[in-house]
Design a protein with these regions (language model features):
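Exposed beta-sheet edge and beta->alpha loop/turn motif
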Residues: 429-470
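Active-site SXXK
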Residues: 39-42, 56, 62, 86-113, ...
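Bacterial N-terminal signal peptides
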Residues: 9-23
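Short, conserved catalytic-motif segment at the N-terminal edge
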Residues: 29-89, 109-114, 169, 314
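Short solvent-exposed beta->alpha transition segments
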Residues: 389-434
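Short, surface-exposed loop or secondary-structure junction motifs
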Residues: 72-75, 127-324
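Short, gly/Ser/Thr-rich active-site loops of penicillin-recognizing serine hydrolases
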Residues: 343-407
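Short, well-ordered beta-strand elements
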Residues: 319, 329-345, 451-452, 461-467
Length: 470
């Protein structure tokens, strides 16, 4: 499921965290202080969110450099999480379905611009929607599972055909190619196309063409075989209640859109293949990672099964995943040959994103030479706001309008008592709306804040906002 950039972590009870053994790697070993910082990011995130466990893999210089699992995989028997355990990766599965389509394209068996009607003629406006629009979520087909919980009907088995008989025959939510809207239905359709064109079950095709060549031995299809006693239990929470075992989706509901489970190490192997462009032809990787444009020319920040954006000034291919009991985050920085994989065993929780976005800056140097100066400026502005003042020459007319007398009083009364920040950290940077968005984490002994700024091309700030993290 897609989560907002500025998603706030839940304030939940602190868990006693159990560390598992870490595998050592002869090459691309991370510096000891970097490993310690990763451990702190992960343990802090689990403590703040109450998520039972996380499995983390880091790729550095194109090789697996770090594997570590944190917390308990099973709370009933306090089984420590280990790096070998398989977690459901949810919608991160979509990039494998997209890759299957691209591999069939390399064989000359289909085109990204083929109409869906060539393969499944009975679907709504099938002769207008293309495969490319399916994989980029620009088709208009309505999502069959936007909810963040398992409905009663989803506890029963289903087939892809039955899903499409309902959601594939509804009117489109918009004209194909005119909007971006996340829809699991797109990938069910794409999975059916893979099976029709290849003549094989989707997972068999993925096993032969992707998992076996990349030595991804842990991969399993949770639609066919549920996770076992040696794997983590998936958990949910009702509001701020205790973790409870999450219901398991009936067979078929996750087909092609979210059915895969694997170890963090195996997902990292996939990331390395993206970095090295070792599995598909260069033209396929170009399609995979190129931002899709709408008919009006606006970008979607999405390629084929992956988000395409900039993080700390670096090109990033990423996707999150969520199914019942599990969330995941997968970040790949192909130009820097870096990747971060985080798998967790609680749904509707922010730990996987918090860990991934906390670890990435530890591996990436900002390519913006102004970053240290902007960090110092942000801290100075924050400290001035603690006293109810600002240097108005730093801001645009819009921002100066926002910082009215009442606003400054509220900033001072709420921020002043916090005192001097223990840490003031630059965590994210990207372009949005023609402006540079910079995100900062501000840490105090008993609380954390998030600040974010929008900088205009002339260097003036259009926005300086602050919210609570816990």
């Amino acid at each position: 499921m897609m989560r907002a950039i500025l998603c706030l972590a839940f304030r939940l009870a602190t868990l006693v965290l159990v560390f598992s053994g870490m595998k050592a790697f002869a090459q691309s070993q991370l510096p000891a202080d970097t490993e310690q910082k990763i451990d702190k990011v992960a343990t802090d995130a689990l403590a703040k969110t109450g998520v039972p466990s996380a499995s983390v893999a880091v790729v550095n210089n194109g090789q697996i450099a770090y594997l570590h699992a944190y917390g308990n995989a099973r709370l009933d028997s306090e089984v420590p999480a280990t790096p070998e355990m398989r977690y459901s990766i949810g919608s991160v599965s979509k990039q494998f379905t997209a890759a299957a389509i691209l591999l069939l394209r390399e064989q000359g068996k289909l085109s990204l611009d083929d109409k869906v009607g060539k393969f499944i003629p009975t679907l709504t406006r099938a002769n207008e929607v293309t495969i490319r629009q399916l994989l980029s979520h620009t088709s208009g087909y309505q999502d069959y599972w936007p909810q963040d919980y398992v409905m009663p009907m989803m506890l029963r088995p289903v087939t892809a055909e039955r899903i499409l008989d309902t959601w594939g025959h509804k009117p489109l939510d918009f004209e194909p190619g005119t909007k971006w809207q996340y829809s699991n239905t797109n990938y069910v359709i794409a999975g059916v196309i893979v099976e029709k064109v290849s003549g094989e079950p989707l997972l068999q095709y993925l096993q032969q063409k992707i998992f076996a060549p990349l030595n991804m031995k842990s991969v399993t299809d949770t639609d066919k075989a549920k996770l076992g006693d040696t794997d983590p239990t998936g958990y949910l929470r009702y509001a701020l209640g205790p973790p409870r075992p999450a219901p398991v989706e009936g067979s078929g509901w996750l087909f092609a859109a979210g059915e895969l489970a694997m170890s963090a190490e195996d997902l990292a192997r996939w990331d390395i293949s993206i970095i090295n462009q070792s599995l598909m032809k260069p033209a396929s990787y170009q399609e995979f990672q190129t931002e899709i444009l709408l008919k009006n020319g606006l970008g979607t920040r999405y390629g084929l099964g992956v988000m395409v954006r900039s993080e700390l000034g670096h090109r990033e291919l990423s996707h999150g995943g969520e199914v019942s009991g599990f969330t995941s985050e997968n970040l790949v920085f192909p130009d820097e040959r870096v990747a971060v994989v985080v798998l967790t065993n609680q749904d509707a929780a922010a730990a996987s994103e918090a860990i991934a976005t906390g670890v990435a800056p530890l591996l990436l140097a900002s390519d913006d030479p102004a970053t240290p100066q902007k960090l110092a400026q942000a801290r100075q502005i924050f400290e001035a706001l603690q006293h109810g003042t600002i240097d108005r020459s730093l801001f645009t007319d819009n921002a100066n309008f926002y910082f009215n007398e009442q606003a400054l009083k509220d900033f001072a009364s709420s921020l002043g008592p916090l005192g001097t920040p223990k840490e003031f950290i630059h965590t994210r940077q990207l372009l949005r709306g023609g402006m540079k968005l910079r995100v900062y984490t501000i840490k105090f002994p008993k609380s954390e804040l998030r600040a974010w700024t929008y900088e205009m091309p002339d260097g003036k700030l259009e926005q300086f906002q602050i919210s609570a993290l816990n």
